[in-house]
């Protein structure tokens, strides 16, 4: 299976990439490192990835920033980080990537526990993560080519063992 991992240099990516490389062909992409250097917060960055890689069976996205602070300290620019770099980046990845993903391929996106169980001071993360969860539910109803789409919502990664994260 040929798998494209976006965010392979991040906390989760550094754990799942070696595990997937054992049995699959893995291509990595990221803002600062990877087989392909690309920023998925822009559609041009996403298109650049697919100019360099073809015949993809699965796309795994563990990339995307979001920010939280106390509600009185939040403003449009702070919300915009999660909306642009996490939510819209993953939506655009699906919209563009669907054209390049093989039939019966798979998207795995990432949200986070704050999308379902927010805590005080987490509204920035809650908005982006909750919207990703909703997008995946809606997209699954009509995504073409037999493609599957799912979202994982990890707890704080530092609290999860590597083996539990890989086998989740």
PLM ranges: what are they?
Residues 65-80:
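Conserved mid-core segment of classical short-chain dehydrogenase/reductases
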Residues 147, 151-168:
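C-terminal helical subdomain
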Residues 40-56:
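Conserved Rossmann-fold cofactor-binding substructure of NAD(P)-dependent oxidoreductases
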């Amino acid at each position: 299976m040929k798998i494209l991992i976006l965010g392979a240099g991040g906390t989760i990516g550094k754990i799942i990439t070696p595990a997937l490389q054992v049995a699959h062909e893995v291509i990595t992409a990221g803002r600062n490192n990877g087989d392909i250097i690309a920023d998925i917060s822009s559609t041009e960055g996403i298109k650049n990835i697919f100019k360099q890689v073809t015949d993809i069976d699965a796309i795994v996205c563990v990339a995307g920033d979001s920010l939280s602070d106390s509600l009185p300290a939040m403003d449009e620019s702070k919300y915009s980080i999660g909306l642009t770099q996490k939510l819209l980046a993953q939506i655009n990845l699906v919209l563009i990537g669907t054209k390049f993903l093989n039939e019966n391929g798979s998207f795995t996106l990432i949200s986070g526990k704050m999308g379902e169980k927010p805590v005080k001071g987490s509204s920035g993360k809650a908005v982006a993560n909750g919207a990703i969860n909703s997008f995946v539910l809606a997209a699954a109803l009509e995504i073409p080519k037999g493609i599957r789409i799912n979202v994982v919502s990890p707890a704080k990664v530092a609290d999860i063992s590597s083996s539990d994260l890989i086998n989740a």
